[in-house]
């Protein structure tokens, strides 16, 4: 079977100055063995994800935006799916936990000829895996990655620079 359940909701204030959107998903799929040989052609999947995005207008031409998401996913293929992977003849198994988010501030002049953006974001990934055969205890692995990014951008729009409209981005 393959069961996929989703949820989405959004709300914006009457003034339009603030809003939030949330989502969630849960998926469960059984492993599929097409030819009956005891080995899956499609792996077991169990995943859940949740997240949100919100904004707040700090002025007529400025806003703060925040975003966050979490994903948790387990996959297992091979044979003997109810046993630990090192007890199977062939097994591929991954278990991920991923968190990410961002925060940004945008401001512009009334005519949008001057725009400024500052942002920061992150993603944290934790992964446990097994890729092995013949009951190999050394086929387990783990990975942990943290990614950070931050920056600023300024854009000035010229109605005419030399002979045509242009934008300068710094």
Where are each of the predicted segments found?
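Transmembrane beta-barrel domains of outer membrane proteins
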Residues: 8-14, 23, 53-57, 104-110, ...
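Outer-membrane beta-barrel translocator/receptor signature
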Residues: 1-35, 43-50, 61
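Membrane-embedded beta-strand positions of outer-membrane beta-barrel proteins
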Residues: 20-24, 52-54, 66-68, 116-120, ...
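Flexible loop and strand-edge segments within Gram-negative outer membrane beta-barrel domains
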Residues: 29-49, 57, 61-116, 122-145
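Short loop/turn motifs that connect adjacent beta-strands in outer-membrane beta-barrel proteins
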Residues: 14-18, 60-63, 108-115, 158-167
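Outer-membrane beta-barrel pore domains and translocons
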Residues: 1-2, 12, 25-27, 69-71, ...
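Hydrophobic, lipid-facing positions within transmembrane beta-strands of outer-membrane proteins
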Residues: 3-9, 18, 48-52, 97-103, ...
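One face of beta-strands
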Residues: 7, 22, 75-79, 148-150, ...
């Amino acid at each position: 079977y393959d069961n996929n359940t989703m949820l989405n909701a959004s709300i914006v204030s009457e003034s339009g100055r603030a809003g939030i959107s949330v989502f969630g998903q849960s998926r469960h799929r059984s492993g599929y063995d097409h030819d009956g040989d005891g080995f899956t052609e499609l792996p077991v999947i169990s995943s859940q994800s949740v997240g949100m995005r919100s904004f707040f207008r700090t002025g007529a031409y400025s806003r703060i935006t925040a975003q966050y998401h979490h994903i948790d996913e387990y996959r297992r293929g091979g044979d003997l799916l109810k046993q630990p992977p090192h007890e199977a003849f062939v097994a591929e198994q991954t278990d991920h936990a991923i968190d990410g988010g961002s925060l940004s501030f945008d401001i512009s002049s009334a005519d949008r000829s001057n725009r400024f953006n500052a942002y920061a974001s992150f993603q944290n990934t934790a992964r446990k895996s097994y890729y092995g055969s013949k009951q190999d205890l050394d086929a387990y692995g783990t990975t942990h990655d943290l990614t950070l990014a931050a920056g600023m951008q300024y854009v000035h729009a010229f109605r005419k620079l030399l002979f045509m409209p242009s934008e300068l981005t710094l």
